[in-house]
């Protein structure tokens, strides 16, 4: 009963907050013994294209940086997914550092996540710094021509040297890292180390992990 009251209060708060910004939020309730299963099923039933998840707050030793629920959702769904760890209000962020893997432009979900990130940066009024390979940079600069924002572009294609970002990032910066599921076009083996790097070297900054829509089958056994 107590959990149901908390659930209703959180949903009502979200609806009220959205209304205060002239947005409409449709609250959905789903009863399921498995939280990941519930979210995955709603994604399919409602035709959801974008998913925002907060980074879990694990207590003690956890087997996964992202958490078992998030890992399950990523493995069994194929929507643009943003995993967000907020350290400061987004309105106070001065720069968004966006790290993009090579061949990201070849993924089917490339235009979708680029538009989402671009809108957030544009609406925040903050500066963007994109780190990408030369080939990928061509596509990002095309977007820049169509929708100019305050931005810089820096060549980056060595994910084995990802920790140079710890020297680039400053206070009031948010770090965006575009990821990939295993065995997809833009996957790099060193991506498996990114969660550990973030946990160890970027504790003072907000960050967002972006998992784009990608070609290939997902495991639908829970749907």
Which role does the model predict for each range below?
Residues 25-40, 134, 150-168:
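A short, well-structured beta->alpha microelement
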Residues 1, 67, 72-77, 89-130, ...:
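Short acidic/Ser/Thr-enriched loop-to-helix initiation segments
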Residues 43-92, 168-223:
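Gly/Ser-rich helix-loop-strand patches that form or flank binding pockets
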Residues 129, 141-147, 161, 182, ...:
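Extended alpha-helical "rod" scaffolds
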Residues 8-12, 137:
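Short, surface-exposed alpha-helical segments at coil->helix boundaries
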């Amino acid at each position: 009963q107590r959990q149901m009251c908390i659930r209703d209060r959180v949903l009502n708060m979200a609806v009220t907050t959205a209304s205060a910004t002239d947005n409409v939020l449709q609250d959905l309730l789903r009863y399921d013994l498995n939280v990941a299963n519930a979210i995955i099923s709603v994604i399919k039933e409602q035709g959801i294209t974008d998913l925002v998840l907060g980074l879990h707050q694990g207590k003690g030793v956890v087997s996964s940086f992202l958490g078992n629920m998030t890992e399950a959702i990523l493995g069994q769904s194929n929507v643009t997914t943003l995993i967000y760890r907020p350290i400061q209000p987004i309105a106070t962020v001065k720069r968004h550092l966006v790290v993009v893997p090579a061949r990201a432009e070849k993924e089917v979900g490339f235009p979708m996540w680029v538009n989402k990130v671009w809108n957030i940066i544009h609406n925040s009024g903050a500066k963007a710094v994109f780190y990408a390979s030369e080939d990928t940079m061509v596509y990002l600069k095309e977007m820049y021509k169509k929708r100019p924002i305050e931005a810089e572009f820096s060549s980056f294609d060595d994910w084995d040297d990802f920790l140079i970002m710890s020297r680039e990032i400053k206070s009031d910066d948010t770090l965006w890292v575009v990821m990939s599921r295993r065995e997809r076009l833009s996957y790099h083996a060193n991506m498996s180390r990114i969660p550990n790097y973030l946990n160890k070297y970027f504790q003072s900054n907000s960050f967002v992990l972006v998992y784009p829509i990608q070609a290939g089958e997902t495991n639908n056994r829970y749907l």
